[in-house]
């Protein structure tokens, strides 16, 4: 009898252990599956990332088209999730100024969302005198350079990057825009420029009211704000940048992530046109020059999203390993050289 009772007890506890094991297995399996679903759900939605400069605080053109779904806070940065022209986008307005800060927001964005391209509409200061460049002109970032990354010899000679003249940055010293992306941006810039009329006061005595487009722009990035024309010439002789306040740092984030980076900057000030810090005097006008020019860059990026957003989400665009254009293209950058021929018909169809 005692042996039978022991056998029954053993069977009872065996059932209990089996039930507990099964429950644990199901709990962790379902929990793991749910966690997996949550992670894959977050990563299954592809977005275009939009980097918005903190200044000028003028985002109306973009925000009017943006249909917000929700906000997501990641660390110190807040991201707005939604769509523009039915294209899924993530927007981040950097919390405070500076290229480094914007690149940090870009890195966190790329790490936490499935970003397929980074777009940056900005304003910048001219490094070329009037007659060639004016306030309101549009610069496409065909080449991105960090013109503050140099060695200066005891005699004042500038050598790019390190004093040896050999860059440790390798393929990250300069960035070149993919040729297809160049066409997309050129078409969008031309579409906006054709419909834009600058106020006569914005270019002072020059009275230029139609923005020129630097189709083959060498965009310069640094954390310097230069009003010294002799120093501008010094860096320009080496790096050939046409403007300052580009976003080489965010371009680095994009290339590391193997996604496209498109930057469009509109010239908002020029020490060659105006005295002091080169900012056009606002007078009694409703908008500042920086707000007017930020609007232009925003409209161009909106046009890129509207016309080519689906392509950016679904196609691959590699970075050119070397300069895709002859040096002569950069010497006469306002000549499109057939860049916009194929897209004019498409733009008419989608206007």
Model-derived regions: residue spans:
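Bacterial N-terminal signal peptides
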Residues: 18-28
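Short polar catalytic/cofactor-binding loops
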Residues: 53-57, 223
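N-terminal amphipathic/basic-hydrophobic helices that include classical n-h-c signal peptides
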Residues: 1-6, 344-345, 349-350
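Bacterial N-terminal signal peptides that target proteins for export
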Residues: 4-20
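Glycine-rich phosphate- or other oxyanion-binding loops that anchor nucleotides, phosphorylated ligands
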Residues: 37-47, 74-348
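N-terminal carbohydrate-binding/catalytic regions of secreted carbohydrate-active enzymes
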Residues: 57-68, 72, 77, 93
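Boundary at the C-terminal end of the N-terminal hydrophobic targeting segment
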Residues: 33-35
């Amino acid at each position: 009898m005692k042996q039978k009772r022991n056998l029954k007890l053993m069977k009872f506890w065996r059932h209990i252990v089996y039930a507990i094991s099964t429950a644990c297995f199901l709990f962790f399996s379902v929990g793991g599956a749910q966690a997996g679903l949550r992670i894959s759900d977050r990563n299954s939605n592809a977005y275009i990332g939009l980097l918005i400069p903190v200044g000028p605080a003028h985002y109306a053109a973009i925000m009017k088209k943006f249909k917000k779904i929700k906000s997501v806070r990641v660390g110190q940065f807040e991201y707005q999730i939604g769509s523009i022209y039915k294209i899924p986008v993530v927007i981040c307005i950097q919390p405070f100024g500076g290229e480094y800060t914007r690149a940090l927001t870009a890195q966190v964005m790329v790490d936490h969302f499935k970003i397929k391209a980074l777009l940056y509409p900005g304003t910048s200061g001219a490094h070329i005198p009037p007659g060639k460049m004016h306030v309101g002109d549009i610069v496409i970032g065909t080449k991105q350079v960090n013109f503050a990354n140099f060695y200066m010899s005891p005699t004042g000679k500038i050598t790019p990057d390190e004093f040896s003249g050999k860059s440790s940055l390798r393929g990250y010293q300069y960035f070149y825009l993919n040729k297809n992306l160049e066409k997309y941006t050129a078409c969008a810039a031309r579409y906006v420029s054709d419909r834009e009329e600058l106020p006569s006061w914005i270019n002072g005595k020059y009275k230029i009211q139609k923005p020129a487009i630097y189709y083959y722009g060498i965009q310069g990035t640094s954390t310097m704000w230069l009003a010294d024309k002799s120093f501008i010439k010094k860096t320009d002789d080496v790096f050939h940048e046409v403007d300052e306040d580009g976003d080489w740092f965010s371009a680095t984030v994009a290339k590391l992530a193997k996604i496209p980076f498109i930057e469009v900057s509109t010239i908002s000030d020029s020490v060659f046109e105006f005295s002091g810090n080169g900012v056009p005097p606002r007078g009694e006008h409703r908008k500042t020059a920086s707000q007017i020019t930020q609007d232009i860059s925003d409209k161009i990026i909106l046009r890129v999203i509207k016309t080519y957003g689906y392509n950016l989400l679904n196609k691959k665009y590699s970075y050119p390993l070397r300069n895709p254009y002859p040096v002569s293209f950069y010497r006469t950058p306002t000549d499109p050289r057939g860049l916009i021929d194929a897209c004019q018909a498409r733009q008419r169809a989608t206007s």
